[in-house]
Amino acid sequence: MSLDDIDSWSIIVVTDELLNFIIFMGCMYDLIGIENFDKENEQWPTDVREISPNHNIDNLRIQWKNWFSDILKMKSKKVKFGEVELNNILVELMYDIDSFKELDYKELREYCIESYPIFMKWWNMPAGGKNALEFHELIESTKVHECIMSIENKIKRKSKPFKLHVDVVYTGVPTVLDFSDNYIVITPNGHVAFNKNWWMRKLKKLV
């Protein structure tokens, strides 16, 4: 979803499929550090599956963390250079979903193959997955708009031109991942949804 004030600012709130799949797969095999969860953002699915005896769990966790970080850096770079056509990255456009051969972290491939259809079933549920997160796109965008109007009233001028890209993931990020002035990752829960003071501090830097 996009909210904008013509010739001034733009806020793009997206439920990115790829980021949410990476988190889903990480939860499914217990590859995400416990520090990424709290009472507002719990690990789900909770039915953790066993990994192959040929793989080391610590190595898989490192690979998962690096993969997640790689995708965030890629998205942040594209936001910086205005490549907004890739707001929502679909898994099947990045990878061959039958093999995930494009994934550099080879040991993760079999877990991606196994978890992808399970993820997509949940992701496309009428009352869950993507639809639940898209509801928060609307809520977050509306409240952010209100914050910008409040700041404009205080400083008695219109906002400077800026673009803010917000990715929404369903869990795994207990605090905001503030990559840059123009790119952040949040969950529907926790202190950012909706922490007005945090948003006011963030937006004052942009407005």
Question: Would you name each region that the model predicts?
Answer:
Residues 1-125:
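N-terminal low-structure segments adjacent to metalloprotease catalytic domains
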Residues 62, 106, 142-145, 149, ...:
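Generic alpha-helical secondary structure signal
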Residues 186-187, 191-207:
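Active-site recognition of the HExxH zinc-binding catalytic motif
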